[in-house]
């Protein structure tokens, strides 16, 4: 099912995963958090090296607005080259049990269960298929450049669309909006925008605030070596990437400053000590 939903330019990053071992996670939802970090944050930063613009949005009350009828459309892959009627009985059973669970309520699905996350992913994956199909048709009829480069990352109901052509990006975002409306979905107005600061906006706002407001300065740490204590430089963040993000934000506010040069020199020394 999910293999058919895959597209060269559209990546579904929240397909439910199963741990390969029985070891307990170090903290709740560790697998999901790591998946978000690698497939959304890190991939977005990678794409920022290729693209100039990023459209960001998410769906308002996604699970609560799901139309159960769309389960049938998704499992049938309606209006796509892979349309099938093999899953009619499965779709009917899912809708039946959903109505029973919700005392006849015919809109929305429960949230918080891996099963319902899977159902939502099937529906949103089908929406990805429709978006890829519509973009392809627009490239064929000339309303979008045939050689258009773009990438779409979706993590459940969180979308990021990357492109170097601002007009094409607007068209793709409108296509997405119209497709989502067919599923009774609405874009969250306060979270919908086009970003020109792809590096900083690739990171969740709370995490970015923490990074940019925690000073990464040299401090003295005592370590024992050969029975002796010595002072070595230490840093508030262990990882190089967060250190670089701090320097990047500092350079935006104070370009060509002496402090910026000093921070770059300190970072260079830090890298040298690890080589």
Residue ranges and their predicted role:
Residues 59-63, 123, 163-165, 194, ...:
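Short, flexible loop/turn elements at secondary-structure junctions
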Residues 83, 118-156, 161-171:
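Active-site palm subdomain of RNA-directed nucleic acid polymerases
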Residues 69-81, 125-129, 175-180, 195:
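Amphipathic alpha-helical scaffolding segments
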Residues 181-215:
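Conserved catalytic core of two-metal-ion nucleotidyltransferases
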Residues 162-187:
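Helical (often loop-to-helix) elements that flank the catalytic cores of nucleotide-handling enzymes
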Residues 1-111:
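Conserved two-metal-ion catalytic palm core of "right-hand" nucleic acid polymerases
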Residues 5-13, 83-93, 136-153, 188-194:
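Short, glycine/acidic-rich hinge or "gate" loops at secondary-structure transitions
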